[in-house]
Amino acid sequence: AGHKCGRMHGHGFEVILHADQDLVGRALGVDFDRIDALWAPIHAELDHACLNDLPGLANPTSETISAWIWARLKPQLPELSWVTVYETASCGAHFDGSHYRIWKEMTLDSAVRLARAPAGDPRRRIHGHTYTLRLHLHAALDQVMGWTIDFGDVKTLFAPIFTRLDHHPLHELPGVADNDTASLARWIRAQASPLLPVLDRIDLYETRGCGAILGWAEDGPALP
């Protein structure tokens, strides 16, 4: 009661459909035109619509939307393996027919120095990055709230760690092996796991496309 998400609001949702490819039994792995055709009527239902009025979407969280899409698409597209729903650019949910996963993304502006970089390498000097950090969590759906974990709760629980990272020199952190993204991701896991026990993957990028993925779940790093 009283949660802001209980008030009428809207999002620019985006959806990714993941499909397994049979590269042995077919000449064509995935027929994208077929996926477009199957998606078109679902898109027509969802686009510019009050989602709460659609049967099965009385509580349209990113988790319930991903399951709703799965239920309509899977019978027609057996290759469907995951449905991803972006609620905003920085958070969303995945559903594979059985399990829900969510992620929360944030940025960090931090100073770093790589002690183990080769002699003469400029990365041994103090420099900085605007890091992109994405936390992935795997939990059961709360049937009352319609989500696994409130994105706001993830942000609040992670806040003490975020405060230690953002606008700070990371080379001064106690217990961090070095300032490469893999070492930093391992440090973040050690600090965050007691606060977020359902955390099972950390993505940390120092620049776009350059970083580390640390995962300890069965699904591996295939999902975005």
Predicted regions and their residues:
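Charge-rich, low-complexity N-terminal segments
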Residues: 1-224
